[in-house]
Amino acid sequence: MQGDPNPLKYTDIHNDVVASIVETGSNYYVALATALALTLICFFFPWFYQLYYGIGAAGMNHPGVWGTYLASFIFWIGLSHSGTLLSCVLHITNSSWRKAMYRSAEAMTLFSLVVAAMMVMVHVGRPWFIHWTLPYPNQMEMWPNFRSPLLFDVMAITTYITGSTVFIYMGSIPDFAAVRDRTRGWRNTMYSLLSLGWRGTDREWHRLHWAYTFLAVLIIPLAVSVHSIVSWDFAMSIVPALHHTIFAPYFVVGAIYSGTAGIVTVMFVLRKFMDFGEYITELHFDNLGKLLLVLSLLWSYINIVEVFTGFYSGASGETEALRYRLFGFYAPLYWEMITFCAVLPLLCAFKRFRTSFVPMLFLSIAINIGMYTERFLIVATSLSRQYLPDAWGLYVPSA
């Protein structure tokens, strides 16, 4: 990966970035209104409908008790990983090409974690009783099982949110100061508070670099451990096709894979609609394309190992569960996942494809569609076909 693709003056960069914040035209408000309308129609209206009619409105049944909510939770947790994780790795390796992308990638981490937390609230069904799950003294004597992987999730994800927030905020302090010096009114007051009196002295830069590097080293194993713990929600059960020791690396690789694809999508949007073509260049897409190729090969290898060991073990439950996933009711989704996540990314072997913006956009979207399908298949197929035939059933998401 080559050097800095942006030999531009910092003054020009600051002016362009600040202009995108303070100079909001009609296009900005149209985009904001569209995003809010889609959120209202696609999320809040269905959620209110579910709150009124019950969790069955989402198609929940027996044995499909997790449905798309758990799949969505895993997907958004995974999508959050590459933002901070990739930024930490590139910072430690001193890769200068990260400068044009790392702040937006880190912002994707925070938004993805917020959406993942919202998926938990939706899945509860009756969120006004969510305090029953908290470990506080009460007359119902309902106590969380501290040995449960679900409680591991809460601790790990809370720690990851805290660490990522501190990491992103610390790196943004000089940016807040740059915006502070170029704004007036309430914006100046807000960014003055956020910048903590940053002046840009050598001493401040030295301390910031030391603390930023320390957090980067800390967050890398933290991010890996978070998705490993999420995988234990499944791997520590005795359900066929879930009780696998390979689930931790499988989930971690999948999380980095989907997160990297998400970064490609975000980078395209910033380049196209915010006129950052000078800063987000072919070099960024080229390097991200190489990373997608490597991750797709790792992901494909783990899938091959999972299928091979499942059939090679000779365990009837595992064999039946894998056969059902490959050739049963959900088989079209499985082969769609393989096509989007294992076959199409091979196009990244060609530099002409990696440096083409629109094809890379469609590939990144296809990869995340495939990765969401993977999470859905993990949840749906494993619960649909267990040991006893009288426990078999189908889960189909409601419209």
Task: Tell me the role of every PLM-derived stretch.
Residues 332-357:
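Extended C-terminal subregions enriched in glycine
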Residues 1-24:
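Short, Lys/Arg-rich, polar N-terminal cytosolic tail immediately upstream
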Residues 19-23, 27-47, 138-337:
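Long, contiguous internal "core" modules enriched in hydrophobic/ aromatic residues
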Residues 2-8, 48-58, 62-66, 73-202, ...:
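Transmembrane-helix bundle segments that line or gate the permeation/cavity pathway
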Residues 359-369:
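Central hydrophobic cores of alpha-helical transmembrane segments
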Residues 43-49, 117-127, 302-309, 371-380:
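C-terminal TM-helix exit segments that contain a strictly Trp-centered aromatic cap at the helix terminus
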Residues 66-67, 101, 240-251, 323, ...:
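Non-cytosolic membrane-interface motifs at loop->transmembrane helix junctions
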